[in-house]
Every structure is written in C-alpha cells, then in structure tokens.
Design a protein with these regions (language model features):
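Active-site-facing substrate-recognition patch
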Residues: 9-29, 51-117
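PRPP-dependent phosphoribosyltransferase catalytic core
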Residues: 2, 7, 204-248
Length: 248
C-alpha cells in the first residue's frame, strides 16, 4: 500500500500532467479565468510553475485544481478537439489511446472518481493498456491484462468468450489464474465502449476469479449499446461520448 507521501506525490504529478494537457490547446489566460470563476485564484506565474513542474502545488491545492479542471469543462474541451469521426463512422481511437494529453486527463479523472476504491485495474490488450497502466499507477492498484491468446501452455488461465457479429465468430480473452484474488475490488479500464462485448467478457473474468467490479473507465463511448454490460452497482466514467451509428 502506498504511503501518504507517495499518494501526495501522485496527486501533485497528476495535477501537473493535467495542466500540461490543457496548455497544449488552451491559452493560459483562459485557464486562469476559468479557475478564478470557480474560486481558485492563481497568478499566471504560479500557473506556469505548476504546469511545467518547477514548483508543485500543495496536495490540497492539487486536488482542488483537478476537481476544477474536470468540473469546469476544461478537460472536455481538449477531448472534443482531438476526437474525430470519418465519413464511415470510424472514430480515431488508436490515436487517442496513445495520446499522452488524453491519457493524463483520463487518469486524473479516474483518480478523482475511484481513489481508495480499487485493488486492481483490469483491461484487455492492446489499446486499453496505456490508459490502464496510468490509472493503476494513479490509484496504487495492480494491473491485470487479459489477452487474446494464451502466452504459455503450462499456465492456468481464466477464460471468457467474446461473440463477434461481423463476421460471425468467437474470440477469447485469457487472464493468468491468480492475478486477481477473491474479494478484490476491480476497476475495468478500456479505450472504447461500443457493443459491450469486451466489457462483459472482462466482467466474467473478474467474477470467475471471485473478485467484483466496482467501476468502468473508458476514453470514449459510442452510443449507449454498451450500457447493458455494466455490472450492477458499478460506477461508470467515460471521458467523451460519440454519437455515430456503427457497431463494434
């Protein structure tokens, strides 16, 4: 379990990363004005120091800044600027899944929503790994990655099927047995929620291990067809929802 000082450092680094993500596309004056409207008056000099890491905000200030960044719509502006959908309804998920600005904003949002609530972060290879890694670090949780193939013939695995519709086929996810422990609180993290099939398979893996899902985090959601797969009682955090007619 991380020490209190480690947790404070993580919070400060998340704040600094979120501010840097904002500065990639938003003027410093607009950031300062928005924060001031929420009662956080920060001088341009201090804002610059926080952004580039020459000086870190105190932990309580860092928490207040993160809450303001996500509560004010500033983080949403960044995501909306970077999401694109082509004429075929294809979302640029692979690019977003490796965009450090987006990942830092998503990880800090997950921290605000799930700090102290998750023992493990579970994802499916491969696009979900970057975000899941950052979220696991932010929460001080272990990382569990389910893959499409068995990596060893002698290891035992927990397995879940995924039924694909186009073309009709069956895929599988495999997680080495013992990675998740009975009674652990699991946060499922993925790059995209669309059909809910991957989410349902990851949920079955967690349940087969005797763990239970406390929440779901995703960079993007397309439509609402995935919501049936959310485990009862689990919280959901989606950075941005795209309205297109396509299936995954």
């Amino acid at each position: 379990m991380p020490s209190r000082r480690q947790e404070e450092l993580v919070l400060q680094l998340l704040c600094q990363g979120a501010l840097r993500a904002l500065r990639s596309s938003i003027r410093r004056a607009h950031i300062a004005e928005t924060l001031a409207e929420l009662g956080l008056k920060i001088s341009p000099i201090d804002l610059s120091r926080y952004t580039y890491g020459s000086h870190m905000p105190k932990p309580q200030k860092a928490l207040e800044l993160l809450e303001a960044i996500h509560g004010s719509g500033l983080s949403r502006m960044i995501v909306e600027q970077k999401v694109s959908v082509d004429e075929m309804g294809v979302v640029n998920v692979p690019l977003l899944a490796c965009d450090l600005d987006i990942l830092l904003l998503a990880a800090s949002a997950a921290y605000l929503e799930f700090r102290g609530l998750a023992d493990a972060v579970l994802t499916a290879a491969v696009n979900g790994i970057p975000l899941a890694t950052l979220v696991a670090w932010a929460l001080g949780a272990k990382l569990a990655v389910a893959r499409r193939e068995r990596e060893s013939t002698i290891m035992r695995y927990i397995e879940a099927e995924i039924f694909l519709s186009d073309p009709p086929s069956v895929s599988h996810l495999y997680l080495p047995a013992g990675v998740l422990q009975r009674g652990e609180r699991v946060l499922i993290v993925d790059d995209l929620l669309r059909s809910g099939r991957t989410l349902r398979a990851l949920t079955r893996i967690a349940e087969s291990a005797g763990a239970y899902v406390v929440g779901v985090v995703a960079l993007l959601a397309v439509g609402d067809g995935w919501r049936y797969a959310v485990p009862e009682g689990a919280r959901v955090l989606v950075l941005h929802t795209v309205r297109v007619s396509a299936g995954r």
